[in-house]
């Protein structure tokens, strides 16, 4: 399966870990990473920021990759711009499910799942949940009961699944 990850800001070990895990399971993963220099408080020159953030280029890259799944990791200060970008992705790739995780999602799942641009949430560790999700997608089976996921079905019902045990030892995961 083809998974497109998006992250903005600084490097993110959680995203890198999930990507490494999925690669080790044979999935093709791609990262759209934006340094977002204007977000850090050191560089705030609106004229220059437009050169570092180009929504059309991001959307074009997503379309070229042809993902089966789009994944976002969200921290609260980036919730609004990520929601805007997810809506753009949903417009051009309407049949591609969008999943998001991260500290914002774990802290505010009820608010996040209400958004029309997000199809599912991952609460807690994503490695096993993402692998189970992709396996079910490949087999064209329902993934409404995958642990660690909240899944919004076609009728709008939200399936809030239990959490899975944490991964121990962490050294069992591939290195990012």
Task: List the model feature ranges, each with a label.
Residues 6, 27-29:
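Hydrophobic, aliphatic-enriched repeat segments that assemble into extended interaction scaffolds
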Residues 15-21:
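Short amphipathic alpha-helix
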Residues 174-176:
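Pyridoxal 5′-phosphate
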